[in-house]
């Protein structure tokens, strides 16, 4: 199961690498793109931190043992479903890339 995730991640990184190689940017624009990338990263990290803090505050305010059990059960079911669909997606992607033999 871990090999599938590693393979899917490798394929995504490979596609992104080809996209980066294909986009030839003049030297002058690289500084502007770097600052834009930094701004986007900082913005996403700030959104993530605020969302995480809000979720933690909400969890602390509504902490009940029955609710905690329901959340844990929902998390385990959803991760099982997601891992199933990721496996299906990976298999489909590999068969698409490999082609019919």
From Swiss-Prot:
Residues 66-74 are annotated as: Lipid binding. This is Apolipoprotein C-II. Residues 78-101 are annotated as: Lipoprotein lipase cofactor. Keywords: Chylomicron, Glycoprotein, HDL, LDL, Lipid degradation, Lipid metabolism, Lipid transport, Secreted, Sialic acid, Signal, Transport, VLDL. Disulfide bonds: none annotated. GO terms for cellular component: chylomicron; high-density lipoprotein particle; low-density lipoprotein particle; very-low-density lipoprotein particle. It comes from Tapirus terrestris (Lowland tapir). InterPro entries: Apo-CII, ApoC-II_dom_sf. It is found in: Secreted. Pfam families: Apo-CII. Component of chylomicrons, very low-density lipoproteins (VLDL), low-density lipoproteins (LDL), and high-density lipoproteins (HDL) in plasma. Plays an important role in lipoprotein metabolism as an activator of lipoprotein lipase. Both proapolipoprotein C-II and apolipoprotein C-II can activate lipoprotein lipase. GO terms for molecular function: phospholipase activator activity; phospholipase binding.
């Amino acid at each position: 199961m871990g090999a599938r995730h590693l393979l899917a991640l490798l394929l995504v990184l490979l596609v992104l690498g080809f996209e980066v190689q294909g986009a030839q940017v003049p030297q002058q624009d690289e500084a502007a793109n770097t600052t834009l990338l930094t701004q986007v990263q900082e913005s996403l990290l700030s959104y993530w931190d605020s969302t995480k803090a809000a979720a933690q505050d909400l969890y602390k305010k509504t902490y009940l043992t029955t609710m905690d059990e329901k959340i844990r059960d929902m998390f385990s079911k959803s991760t099982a479903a997601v891992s199933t669909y990721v496996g299906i997606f990976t298999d489909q992607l590999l068969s698409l890339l490999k082609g019919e033999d």
